[in-house]
Amino acid sequence: MGKFQVIDHPLIQHKLTMIREKNCGTKVFREVVNEIAMLMAYEVSRDMPLEDVVIETPMGKSTQKTLSGKKVAIIPILRAGIGMVDGILELIPAAKVGHVGLYRDEETLQPHEYFVKLPEDIASRQLFVVDPMLATGGSAIMAIDSLKERGASNIKFVCLVAVPEGVKALQEAHPDVDIYTAALDERLNEDGYIVPGLGDAGDRLFGTK
């Protein structure tokens, strides 16, 4: 079973409270989502492998550490996942970015794929799949299904808020995928929204209704 981790760093929790507030405007919401994503990426990337290299410092040769192994690709689930990309790129600027477009049927709550655009070397990269919310788990499962069909195998899922039923569904569908969240909330309401949650993260990021 993949790892499940709530990243409860004080700065992340403080910033998450800011964007939970219903009167948080679009500008602040967007900025703080990016900040949380950057802070989370520090923990998500903690197990990236290192190797020794010999470099020349001003004082002579020295053996130091550098990243090795698979390079990173960030895969936002459209559209809300886009809001987390720039924050991670601040920390890992060389990462490539792909996109998986899904929409949720408001009646059945089932996801439907409408767009996929990925780096050509997706199979050789460590993927960070990002979406602010892990609710029913349907969108995350479908996105990861799509990535695996295209050769991806090293996948981490990163969200801001999750609920137990979404975590359980994703773990059952993809037990090899590590899940990282800033908060594990109480439940889903009858409309499939997380409570207390953030509301509709996409609408709040882009100022739409």
From Swiss-Prot:
Pfam families noted in UniProt: UPRTase (PF14681)
Family (UniProt): Belongs to the UPRTase family.
First-tier enzyme category under EC: transferase
An annotated Gene Ontology molecular function: uracil phosphoribosyltransferase activity
Protein's recorded name: Uracil phosphoribosyltransferase
Cofactors (names): Mg(2+)
GO biological process, one term: uracil salvage
Keyword S-adenosyl-L-methionine carried by entry: no
Entry binding sites for uracil: I194, G199, D200, A201
Activity regulation, per record: Allosterically activated by GTP.
Record's keyword terms, sorted: Allosteric enzyme, Glycosyltransferase, GTP-binding, Magnesium, Nucleotide-binding, Transferase
Gene: upp
Catalysed reactions listed for this entry: UMP + diphosphate = 5-phospho-alpha-D-ribose 1-diphosphate + uracil
UniProt pathway annotation: Pyrimidine metabolism; UMP biosynthesis via salvage pathway; UMP from uracil: step 1/1
Function: Catalyzes the conversion of uracil and 5-phospho-alpha-D-ribose 1-diphosphate (PRPP) to UMP and diphosphate.
